[in-house]
Amino acid sequence: MSKIWILLLLVGAVQFARGFPALEEEQEDDVIDWPSFEYDLSDEERGKGLDWLKKQWGKLKNSFKKVGAKVTATFNKGRDYLKKKGIKVDPLNCQGNKCRSCVIFTLKPKKFCIEYVFSTSAITVSLIKEKDDEEKVLLGPFTIKTGNIPKCCKLGSFIGELCLQGVEGRLKSSNGKPHVNLCVGLLLKKFGCGAKICVSYVDGKFSVSFKPKLFAGDEENGTIMEAGEKEDEGKVIDAVPE
């Protein structure tokens, strides 16, 4: 693909993003209100649609960069915890634009769940603790807007501080079809571990929820950072599905 075509693709994505109305702070409607779109697959994309999307999204991934000693130490702590399989995240269970996923600590059995309501450029979140088949709302519901700095809150001495950040990615194909990914970055600062939970919005409706991605991570300069393969490298969390 030529550089000119890539530039045109990105310009189209920006123009598409500007066409979406902003979500008002006081809006409490849980019903998605995004426009409907024409969605006609070409013969090429019928056979290779998923591969094509993965390739295009891959070009929009954030790049890894060097991080400082403090962040590197947190990354290493997270890597060690993940190697022990001390934490896992359930796949999203969705009904319409309302989804739920649970974070499970395996070394010291504890579990809390997060409920998401995905809406235009924002995600409404509730935190729920599960114990002995009983649920207790810890926080929320509250709204995180995509593109904003993380919202952080303390959840007790064991879990510590939890940070949530909304990110989105928008893409147009050569036929003008919009593909939008909405993701929530979840960071457990005490453990140096995070998760990225994403859904895809295509043809005027939610179509795909992706398997949550666990990563070693930290917060730096007002954003959640995801550790790379190299010890001292990380990247700003993005909305590219894995």
Curated annotation (Swiss-Prot):
Tissue expression per record: Expressed by the venom gland (posterior main gland) (at protein level).
Segment forming the signal sequence: 1-19
Transmembrane segments: none
Compartments it resides in: Secreted
Protease recorded as keyword: no
UniProtKB keywords: Disulfide bond, Secreted, Signal, Toxin
Post-translational modification: Contains 5 disulfide bonds.
Function: Highly abundant protein that may be responsible for the observed disruption of sensory neuron membranes, since it is homologous to proteins such as trialysin, which forms pores in lipid bilayers. Probable insecticidal toxin.
Family under the similarity heading: Belongs to the redulysin-like family.
Official protein name in the record: Venom redulysin 2
Classification of source organism: Eukaryota, Metazoa, Ecdysozoa, Arthropoda, Hexapoda
